[in-house]
Regions:
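A short His-aromatic
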Residues: 3-5
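S-adenosyl-L-methionine-dependent methyltransferase catalytic module, highlighting the catalytic core
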Residues: 7-22, 26-153
Length: 156
């Protein structure tokens, strides 16, 4: 959920995580990556027509503007019906306020003092307690036409 708070608050959150973790403690983060949106944009011809029609994002310009404006800045009032029963209402508390990539996380976490920043596959971990924790929206409509998450583990 770190993508739902702005960059300054996200940095404060990471600092607080570092402060309260015991030495050797592990933090795991999983969130969408801005690289995913860029991949969709640059590989638009590979996105299925079905996904484009269901999402209403039928051109790559419309897709990237939706991503930048609605998801990053927040948009009041638009309702997005995902599968006929679940609706996400855009409001300033829902949409993405800051999107990360691996380089950004790596820099910030190491600057704060974390060590061993490891980018891992979703649902996988060297720690049995951290395996399979990620949960994403389900349903017949897939929100992203590609896999685009960042999952990382880092130690204090």
């Amino acid at each position: 959920m770190i993508e739902h708070i702005d960059e300054v608050d996200g940095y404060s959150f990471l600092n607080e995580c570092y402060r309260i973790l015991k030495p050797g403690g592990v933090m795991r983060i999983s969130c969408p990556s801005i690289d995913g949106a860029m991949d969709v944009y640059h590989n638009w011809d590979n996105v299925s027509d079905e996904w484009k029609q269901e999402s209403g994002l039928v051109t790559k310009a419309r897709f990237i503007n939706h991503f930048i404006y609605y998801e990053t800045a927040g948009y009041q009032g638009k309702k997005f019906e995902a599968d006929g029963s679940i609706k996400m209402v855009n409001n300033p508390n829902y949409w993405h306020k800051y999107m990360y990539d691996r380089e950004d996380f790596d820099y910030k976490l190491k600057y704060i003092g974390f060590s061993d920043v490891n980018f891992v596959n979703k649902h996988e971990s060297q720690y049995s307690e951290l395996k399979g924790l990620e949960r994403r929206f389900g349903g017949k409509f897939k929100l992203w036409p590609i896999e685009s998450d960042i999952t990382l583990e880092t130690k204090k």
